């Protein structure tokens, strides 16, 4: 449980590096949890979670208006860490923690890319696996426009969330 919580919180924080990336990915994950909680029906815990999750979706959509490229408002560590905590806590309360690697795949990829970069750097005495970690910066340095990286990561998250909903 602790590893899931820590990994998700850090994954959300690592994802907050491009305009609109963390907020667009997290709004989709929060939508997944809203639909999942509503689908759980008469469960008292789920009945208390879906309004909070729905409010998170609404607040992120409002924030996203000002956070997309070129961003005028930035989330910062406080926001991204809080969103990671929200995702982890919601998954744990709904007993869907095994769904985090599916619906929050982007978070996991971001964390794993940083871990792989550090490990490879130490093992090869200074060589890099990626141009920069987390992986979204690698794509950006490879010439991808920031908006393309955000769009692809958001589409990937949407597909993963749909897979998660089908799996429930």
Q: Residues of each region from the PLM?
A:
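Alpha-helical transmembrane segments
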Residues: 1-168
């Amino acid at each position: 449980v602790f590893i899931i919580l820590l990994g998700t919180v850090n994954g959300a924080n690592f994802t907050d590096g491009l305009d609109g990336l963390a907020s667009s990915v997290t709004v989709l994950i929060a939508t997944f949890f809203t639909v999942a909680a509503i689908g759980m029906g008469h469960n008292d815990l789920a009945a208390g979670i879906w309004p909070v999750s729905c409010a998170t979706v609404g607040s992120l959509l409002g924030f996203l208006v000002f956070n997309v490229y070129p961003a005028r408002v930035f989330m910062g560590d406080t926001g991204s860490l809080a969103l990671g905590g929200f995702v982890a806590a919601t998954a744990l309360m709904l007993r869907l923690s095994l769904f985090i690697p599916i619906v929050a795949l982007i978070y996991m990829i971001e964390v794993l890319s940083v871990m792989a970069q550090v490990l490879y750097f130490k093992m090869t005495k200074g060589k890099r696996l990626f141009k920069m970690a987390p992986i979204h910066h690698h794509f950006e340095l490879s010439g991808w426009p920031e908006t393309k990286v955000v769009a692809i990561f958001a589409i990937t998250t949407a597909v993963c969330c749909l897979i998660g909903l089908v799996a429930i």
